[in-house]
């Protein structure tokens, strides 16, 4: 695929440190979105835009100043609100440099829908390649997904293998065999299978794959999505994981 006509670049800009944001609705962000699918527009200071240091690859593969909601033109079937991406970026920018966020998450998606060859997977990889083409360097994949896979025992049983395959596929297709991947252990979903899913996520043992536990973060009234404040906290936890475990080796 030729991205040469799609990417707006500025050769004077330093190389962007690229972070792929992927998974389902809690990565896309539902913070501040009410039951009537209306976002309250509240942006905490931790999620503030920074026109010099935090950018976003939009749906048209152009860089723009990143601001909430990060996934508004990516996860288009639902109203997006605050997710963890902006608080993460603000927390790492002073150490990591100019940040390029690549939002790819889509609400309500199961891990099998992210298999190589499917639309979601190919879109994620193509967006990541487009970001690199414009002068960026991929630093990590942030992954928050799994609620949809608590629907049945079969889904739970297949999750570990599907997630490990996804990790190996992404690394191979991006040519980054040691790509850091920070996944989030879910805290919502079908209660019957939730704890088993969390055990699976926390137990994935692949080099440069770590897990941040969302346990204790506040859920909205729907008991599925994180509140705005919880998303801010999650972004900070993801940032600490990256800074403490991966920044030096990158």
Residue spans for each PLM region:
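Cell-envelope and extracellular/periplasmic
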Residues: 2-250
